[in-house]
A protein has these predicted regions:
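A short acidic/histidine/glycine-rich donor-binding loop in glycosyltransferase catalytic cores
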Residues: 233-240
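A charged, aromatic-enriched C-terminal amphipathic alpha-helix characteristic of glycosyltransferases
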Residues: 258-290
Length: 293
């Protein structure tokens, strides 16, 4: 949000909403409507009159677990274009092929990643794993697979869940520590090595972690559509999967003084800050807006 305000090409007006929004007041003073996301989460239940405006509507794509219920809002909210950091193939696995979509990377607020602890001053012999994990107990997996076969937490975070069980991994849930939101880099700077793992698609952690100067072990598979984010194995990160993750961790832990880890971490930091910063994302969003008006 701050990056949109900083962008010289945009004159942004934030609209505070209640349960319903009268969109008629936007007529005549708005070129583009940008929606927080295409779901009821964080949005008004009704955008009254939005279809009468003849103003382009762009929406950030909601969490994939809400995609099925969000499809009906495409017509109801008259959405012209979608964006997020997902690959186009992943988006169209979830939504109809005629829904227009653009991949736009964002998530690194550059100022939050400045002056962090140097790589060699960080914890070496432990690996950080943070974020939600699933319940891997047999009965729980069966119940969750019946209720929500694909998008339950365990199926979305299989490798992350497995990593949390390793005795050399420090695991913390997202909201069970003091380093949430803008303070997350202050947790990351404690560790040389961290884990970014998601079953179906790379998420914001994949670039926040290297941006903080961490050697980032990234789950990267055909299943999770990860290649589009541009990181390279053994150059800007270390790729892992369910078959090799322990081997990759042991390679690092058995040789923590090897200078190549710092080199990969530094390369990853430079790549993440250059390609995933919020100002670049805002500029790409401005490009999309320009195309539609």
């Amino acid at each position: 949000m701050k990056a949109l305000k900083r962008n010289d090409r945009l004159d942004v007006q934030y609209i505070k909403t209640d349960a319903e929004l009268d969109c008629s007041k936007l007529k005549g003073n708005t070129d583009v409507i940008l929606l927080w996301e295409n779901s009821p989460f964080g949005m008004p239940s009704e955008l009254n009159g939005i279809k009468d405006l003849e103003i382009p509507v762009i929406s950030r794509v909601t969490d994939p677990s809400r995609a099925k219920a969000s499809k009906i809002l495409n017509e109801k909210w008259d959405i012209d274009y979608y964006f997020n950091f997902f690959s186009e193939s992943f988006f169209h696995d979830l939504y109809p092929k005629d829904f227009k979509y653009k991949t736009i990377f964002y998530g690194v607020e550059s100022s939050l990643f400045e002056n962090l602890k140097p790589f060699n001053d960080r914890i070496k012999k432990r690996i950080l794993n943070s974020g939600n994990i699933g319940n891997d107990k047999f009965i729980s997996k069966i119940i969750n697979d019946v209720r929500n076969p694909k998008w339950n937490t365990y199926r979305c975070k299989v490798l992350r869940t497995k990593c949390s069980k390793l005795d050399y991994v420090d695991y913390t849930r997202t909201l069970e520590h003091n380093f949430v939101s803008d303070d997350y880099p202050l947790l990351l700077e404690k560790y040389q090595a961290v884990i970014a793992a998601d079953t179906y698609s790379p998420i914001q952690k994949y670039w926040e972690m290297p941006a903080a100067g961490c050697l980032t072990f990234m789950e990267m598979t055909e299943k999770n559509h990860g290649k589009h984010i541009g990181f390279k194995d053994n150059e800007t990160s270390i790729f892992i999967n369910e078959k090799n993750y322990e081997e990759k961790f042991h390679e690092y832990l058995s040789d923590v003084e090897n200078k190549k880890w710092e080199e990969i971490a530094n390369n990853g930091k430079n790549f993440a800050i250059k390609n995933f910063n919020n100002d670049l994302g805002a500029d790409h969003l401005a490009d999309l807006m320009q195309e539609l008006i």
